[in-house]
């Protein structure tokens, strides 16, 4: 009986981890000088290891997703270039 309860609880915990929403992390930076803005990525395919291309005030950077909302995924597009923006 106890093993069945444990199995059910384990399965519920596992599913909540797998099915939870993922977001770009919220940036701790609120502003950036124009000469410091750069894009390390323009889309998720530019990132490696399961990280996402996330927008920050200082440009786009590869970040690992988190379960806390607040960040913003990079829009990409044809005008996006990976380099300094100025």
Curated annotation (Swiss-Prot):
GO terms for cellular component: extracellular region. InterPro entries: Elafin-like_sf. Contains 5 disulfide bonds. Residues 21-66 form the WAP domain. Its main location: secreted. Residues 1-20 form the signal peptide. GO terms for biological process: defense response to bacterium. It is found in: Secreted. Expressed by the venom gland. One of its GO terms (molecular function) is toxin activity. It comes from the Eukaryota. Keywords: Antibiotic, Antimicrobial, Disulfide bond, Secreted, Signal, Toxin. Disulfide bonds join 24-54, 32-58, 41-53, 42-80, 47-62. Has antibacterial activity. Belongs to the venom protein 11 family. 01 (wap-1) subfamily. This is U15-lycotoxin-Ls1a. It comes from Lycosa singoriensis.
